Amino acid sequence: LRPRAPAQAEEREWRHWFRGPASEPRFPFARRFLRNDLAEALQRTVPKDARVLEVGSGTGDLLNALPNRSRTGIDYSPTAVAEAHKRYPTLEFAEGDALSFHRDERYDAIVADRLIHSVPDVQLLLENLSAHLAEHGRIFLTCYNYLWESPLRLGERAGLRLATPPSNWLGETDLQNLFSIAGLEVVKYEDRLLLPASVPVVADLLNRYVAKLPLLNNLSLYRLYVLRKRGTAVTTAPKVTVVVPARN
């Protein structure tokens, strides 16, 4: 299953949007809260010695929050890449299209935060990410819960997030089919954030505990998938202990 590619005018609108200047919403606290939440999840999940590539790295804030020594960011926007170089000169950033960039190196961890909502071809994105993944590497991919589409649009009007062109909104079945076609399989996933705002006590209670409960987890803002190439699961050979009774 390949989702219908957006009309050419719509694709041009997205590419023009990505080429625009790096900017923050009028009230950036919700965006920062979401970024910090994802950073916390990645810090806990990505191995410390992993070579990390973030596709759609923007100004580099998420990549900088990771403790890994080897960190590379790719972004379509030249102004975002320039700003990332300025903010974090010790990290590596390069300009590139998520669907067609090429790197000689293979990475242990590839991060793609909400990219599937904006690229013109989700399958091509997944295939390119997989092509840059080390044999036993992992892709960390996030996407919004489709139930939040209307609240997120209201957030744009309220200045809580940047206004974007029309987005891809894919159901779980569509995503699973796309993962399979790209030769990927889900290792695990995690639903995160019932309340994407820093409200003392309440946010911690909802996001840390209530969001993990059955059924209620389906209302979370976004899902973090951990993917691997199909057929690369690490298998451990069985161990056998042989005990031979003997008489001294």
Task: Tell what function each PLM region has.
Residues 123-135:
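A short glycine-rich, Lys/Arg-flanked "PGG" loop and its adjoining helix->strand segment in the class I
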Residues 238-241:
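Cell-envelope/extracellular polymer assembly enzymes that use nucleotide-activated donors
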Residues 58-99:
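Class I SAM-dependent methyltransferase SAM/SAH-binding core
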Residues 117, 244-248:
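Active-site beta-to-alpha loop of glycosyltransferases that engages the nucleotide-sugar donor
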